C-alpha cells in the first residue's frame, strides 16, 4: 500500500528523490498544445458556432443560448438546500471582509522630490472573466474567491464561465453564488473554448481584459496561450500541501489534512515534514487508517505516488518547505508564528492545529486561488491587486525641469535619441 510514498530523512534524500518531490506535477503543455491551439483558433474565427460544437463534443449537451437567464437562477434557488445558500452568504461576508482590508492598504501616492511632483493613482481593470471549473465536481466557493476580489477592486464588468451540467443547465450552487455576489453575467461554457471566448469575445460572450481562476491542464494551457491577448492571474496545477509538524503535532489532524488534500485529485501532492521519527511513523499509520474509511479512496491512493513523509530538525523542515514553495503550508508546531517568520515561499499559510486548509478553501476569508508547482516562489495568490493597475504621473515646472535637464539630455544623446534631448532643450530656451 505504501508503494510510491517516500518516507525518509531529509538529509538522506538522493538528488533524484529530492527533485522528484520538489518538481512535482510540472505540466507537459507541449503534448496537448496542438489540440488547445485548434480550439482557440476555431473560437476566434467562428465564435458561438465553435462554442456550440465543442460543448456538444466535450460536455455532451447541445446549448443554443449560453447566457444564464433570471429564470434559471430562480430555479437554482428552488433546487438547493437553504443551508447551502446560507453557507454561501456567510462565506461571502468573510471573504469580503478580508479583501476589503487588503484594499484599505492600497493607496494613491503623491510626493515631491527636488521640485518634481511624483505620484501614482490606482485604477481597477475594467472587464474580468472568472473561470469556475466543473467536471468531477462543481465549485461555488471558486465563484466567491474569483469574483469578490474583483468586486472589491472596483471592476466594472465581471463574467463567469463554467461548464454545463449533463442536462445543459448551470450548476445550481454555482449560479446562486454568482447571483449573491452580483456578477454581470454567467455563461454555461467550460474548457478551452471558454478561455477562448473570454480572450477573443464571441457574439454572446464579451472579450475581457483579464482571465482568472483554476482549471485542468487544458484550461491552464489555454490561459498560457492567450496571455498577451488578455492578462491572466497565473498558471495553476493540481492541489498541493506541505505540512511542518513537530513532536507536539496531533498525528490524527495531520493525517486528516493529508487526506483532505489528496482527495482533490490523483495528481495532488502532499508532503509532511516532521522533527520526530516517532511522529512520522504515527502519522503514516494514521494516514492509512483514514484511507480505509475515505469515500474517495482510489483518488487518494493514486495521490500517494506524489507524496512523502520527511524527517529532519525544524530548520531542515523550514528549508525544505522554502525549496518546495507549496500552494498550502500548514505549520503544526509549538510556536507556528516563529516558523512563519522564516517562510519565504508559500501560497497561503495555516497556523496551528485548528487552522486546517479547508477553512481557507471555503470560509476564513483568505483566497483559495493559489499558485502551485513552485509558482509561489514568484507569484501571490489571487487578491485585490490582481485586479488593479497603478498609473504613475509626474509634474515639473521650468525650474525643476532645469534641475534634471542635463541628465535627460546626456542620456538621450548617449542612446542616439536626439529628439528626446531636443524636447527638453527647447523648453529651456
From Swiss-Prot:
Enzyme class: oxidoreductase
Residues that, per the record, bind Zn(2+): 261, 264, 361, 420
Positions of substrate binding: 239, 261, 264, 328, 361, 415, 420
InterPro entries assigned to the protein according to its UniProt record, in alphabetical order: Ald_DH/histidinol_DH, Histidinol_DH_CS, Histidinol_DH_monofunct, Hstdl_DH
This enzyme's EC code(s): 1.1.1.23
Active-site residue list: 327-328
Residues holding NAD(+): 131, 193, 216
GO BP terms: L-histidine biosynthetic process
Keywords, alphabetical: Amino-acid biosynthesis, Histidine biosynthesis, Metal-binding, NAD, Oxidoreductase, Zinc
Cofactor: record remark: Binds 1 zinc ion per subunit.
GO cellular component: cytoplasm
Pfam families hit by this protein: Histidinol_dh
Reactions catalysed: L-histidinol + 2 NAD(+) + H2O = L-histidine + 2 NADH + 3 H(+)
Pathway annotation: Amino-acid biosynthesis; L-histidine biosynthesis; L-histidine from 5-phospho-alpha-D-ribose 1-diphosphate: step 9/9
Cofactor: Zn(2+)
GO MF annotation terms: histidinol dehydrogenase activity; NAD binding; zinc ion binding
Family: Belongs to the histidinol dehydrogenase family.
Function of the protein: Catalyzes the sequential NAD-dependent oxidations of L-histidinol to L-histidinaldehyde and then to L-histidine.
Protein name: Histidinol dehydrogenase
Recorded name of the encoding gene: hisD
